[in-house]
Amino acid sequence: MPKGSEALTNARKEEIIDACAALYETMGFRDITIRDIGARTSFTRTSIYNYFQTKEEIFLALLQREHEAWIADLEEMARQETALTPEGFADRMACTLERRACMLKLESMNLYDMEGSSRMENLVAFKRTYGRAMEAVARCLETFFPAMTEQEVREFLYAFFPFLFGVYPYAVPTEKQRRAMALAGVEAARCSIRQLVRVFVLKMLRPFQQPPAES
């Protein structure tokens, strides 16, 4: 790590991650190089190696940042005092993930590459953040569905988080994939990230619908 203030180090890391995120909006993971990322920063390409050893580490840091933003949304959701029905909860959860398309894309398409080519310390930092995301979802469930047992919350998490790995490819197929489905005569439903998440969460929480209060 280069000498300098912690603030400068963090600012440069953020600039590198920002450049990576911008490129990922229009280019594929395998097509992006550290040279491409460096061309979008205010310092030399070789300086990037002071902060990240591989491009996969940069992408892993981007994925970690996306999870941190999601956690912030989940924590805000849990703090609200208004009760939520399963329908309301499902819609709120779907909204938080609709804003995290980059997160869903990275973890569904490039996770093994990122983790395999990153140093253990970087991977551990990401896994800690991933664990915090699971805890944040659990807190939301405990807040709005107090009747759920610890086992039921755990079962929701172990169904929900694996489900998230398939959301992006299903919601955002490539043009080539669409054409192949059409040529194969397979009907492809058009569903958004929000729609997919909402339907899944609602189905999982239907059993915990509170009965209407007696008059």
Model-predicted segments: where are they?
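Helix-turn-helix
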Residues: 15, 23, 30-57, 61
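A contiguous binding-surface segment within folded domains or other stable secondary-structure elements
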Residues: 111-142
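Membrane-interface starts of transmembrane alpha-helices
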Residues: 145, 149-157
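Helical hydrophobic small-molecule/effector-binding pocket
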Residues: 90-115, 170-172
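Hydrophobic alpha-helical connector segments
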Residues: 61, 75-103, 156-160
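C-terminal peripheral helix-coil segments that are non-catalytic and often amphipathic
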Residues: 135-147, 163-215
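Short, basic, alpha-helical segments at the C-terminal edge of helix-turn-helix-like DNA-binding modules
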Residues: 64-70
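Basic, helix-initiating cap at the start of DNA-binding domains
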Residues: 1-27, 35-36, 40, 81
